[in-house]
Amino acid sequence: NYIGTYYPLEFNQNGEVFLKQAEHYVELNKRMELARSFVVGEMMNLEYNLQTSGIKKESIKISPKILQIEKSRTVEELMIVEAGIRQEYYKEFDKLTNNPDFKFEKRTKQPPKNEVNALISFGNCMMYSDILKCIFKSHLDPRIGYLHSTNQRGFTLNLDISEIFKPIVVDQAIFHITGQRLLTKKDFRTFENGVYLNEEGRKKFITEYEKQLKKTVFSREKGRYMSYKLLMQSEVYKIENHLLQIKPYKPYIHI
C-alpha cells in the first residue's frame, strides 16, 4: 500500500549545477524560458487528451493561447495564462471521464468536493512524489522551481515538471478508471467536508496509475519506445543539460 514518500536528508548535489540552477531562477529571462517551456508542454499534452477523445476540433480552445504564453513577461502573468488553459480543458472533463455517476462540475481541492476531484488530487500527489524521486537521481535541487516560485513549501521543481506529465499519466489513468467503471461510490469516503478515496479505492487507483507509468510510447527525441516512467527521468536530465548549456531544453510533448 502507498503510505508516503521518503527522501534523503542530503541530495546528490553538484556545486556547478546548483549555481546554474540558482542563476536560472534569479535571472528573469532564463527563468521565464524554462517556465514557458513547462506550460507549453502542459498545454500540448492537455490538447492531446482532447483531440484523441473525439471532441470536435472547433470546441478545443487551448492552442490559441500559445501566443499568450509567448507574450507573458512575468511568472505571475504566465500562471494566469496557465490557469486559463486548465479552465478550458476542464470544461470538457465530463466528456473525458465518460461516466454519469461521477460528475466533475469544477476543480476543487483542499478539500476535493467530489469523486472526480478526489481522483485528480490523489493522482497529482502520486505524480509529484514520482517526479521528486527522479530529481533525487540527478544533481538538481528540487527546492528551486521556475514556474512555481521557490518558497516555504519546500519542493517546487517537481511541481514544474509534473505539469507536463499529469495530463498523459494521471488524467489518462482517471479516464480509464471512470470510463471502464472500475470504481463505484463505495470506493470513496467523506471526511471534514471533503471527498476522498478510501483504502480499497486507493488500491484500485494506484494499480491503474502504475499501469500507465509502465505504458510505452515512441519518443521521437530518443528514437525508441520508452515508458512514461523513463520519460519522466529523462525530462529531469534534459533540464540539467539545459542548465549546463549542453542542450536547450524542450518539454516532452506526446504526439
Residue ranges with predicted function:
Residues N14-I255:
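Active-site helix-to-loop segments that bind/position phosphate- or nucleotide-bearing substrates
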